[in-house]
Amino acid sequence: NPSSQYNLEKILFKYKGLPIQLDSIEARYLYYGIKSTVDLKKSEELRTQFKKEDLKKSLELGEAMLSDNPTDLETISVVMECYYRQQDSSTKLNHYSNQFRKLVDAMLSSGDGKSEKTAFLVNSVSDEYILLAILRKNTYQMKRTSKPSKEGMYDIWDDNGNKTYINVIYDMKF
């Protein structure tokens, strides 16, 4: 609905221009309303250029990818790191940091991760790993089990009895 305050086009416009002004509800509509589709070839090229420390090429690729897929957390994190390493683009770094923070806050506000019923909701496996890193979970020391959920797949991460539940959703209408 174009007149709705939660119209995705309006929210996306605000997110791209002044992400810090997004409220938490808008951020959730944006994160869960836009399905990230990753171009594997472009993503691999971005990783290759980033590993070579070609920051200029990485930024060109990353920003082009974000114009097509603005909620791709993995690409946003690479672009942020490039600007951080350049140390002369604090405005751009702040902009992408605000976008990243709003999307992560949307994931964190989706649940507490303590049960299936209150599992964190994420749009992709890469977002799941980003969330786990933010929660300071060492996935190498944890055991993961998976089981189907109504919306996608539950991943249950067990760290010596301390479990974190994440629901990787395939398609969610928010």
Regions found by a protein language model. Name each.
Residues 4, 75-76, 93:
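TPR alpha-solenoid repeat register
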Residues 78-79, 96:
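Canonical tetratricopeptide repeat
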Residues 39, 73-74:
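Helix-start (N-cap) detector for alpha-helical repeat units in TPR-like alpha-solenoids
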Residues 69-71, 104-105:
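Short coil turns that delineate tetratricopeptide repeat
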Residues 84-108, 136:
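TPR/TPR-like (Sel1-like) alpha-helical repeat modules
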Residues 1-61, 115-174:
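N-terminal alpha-helical interaction modules that lie
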Residues 64-65, 100:
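Canonical positions in the second alpha-helix
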Residues 48-49, 65, 80-84:
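Residue-level signature for tetratricopeptide repeat
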